[in-house]
Amino acid sequence: MEHASTREIYSVQATVRTYESGADGLMKPETVLHWFQEIAEAHASCLGFGYDFVTSRSLAWVEVRLDASVNRLPRWKETVELRTWMAQETPLLARRNLEIRDAQGNCIVAASCLWAVIDIRRRRPVPLNRHISFFPDTPCKETVAPVSMDISGLLPSIREWTAERRDTDFNRHINNAAYLVWALDSLPDSWLENHQLTGIHLHFRKETHAGDSMKSLLFLRDSLTSHHLMHGDELRAEAVLEWKTAEIA
């Protein structure tokens, strides 16, 4: 990734690699989340409160929710621009907006997410201004609205698995991108082959660790799928995915 930034808007040029692409030649949906995590940390470091800053104070940035709109996913070998900007939203939350733009400047993926800083020992959020004296004054309103799905009257399909060590990140819990992978893995191949992902809505509620037994409750209604990602009876994360019928090549 090639970086170019101001303190207000941080931008990166990046090219989609082979291992970031699926069988259809498009970027894997979870790679979008990995890219967003990478540029978010780079921008936070540029502003003076990135990974090194928070870990030196026994703190960590954690993502609370993410809402993304997908016009299309970048193609293998396509070079795109990632853009991000942020601002404090509440005493405990910062909002970060992100975009992926193609070579013509078209926004092909947009996202709006909320982040908190937690005390690593207590695993509890702390007021942002306790440790961070400066936030950009860049306007950072919600650009992608959350989407909910009425699951009343629907019976779920259930899938079970064990959270794996390879999905653990620096914060010693399962990385947020894994929840999207789990949600997608719960869908039948026939659905994935005939539908195109147009929206990703993730609400992260509790940490998950390697070795945790997990299950997915999948609900389908029209162009939405709802995924309750559970550990026993405890909801760890909820995903609502938006779809449209795939175009015939």
Task: State where each predicted segment sits.
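HotDog/MaoC-like acyl-thioester-processing domains
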Residues: E2-V12, D67-D150, T208-A210, F219-A249
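Small beta-barrel nucleic-acid-binding modules, principally OB-folds
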Residues: S58-L73, H195-E207
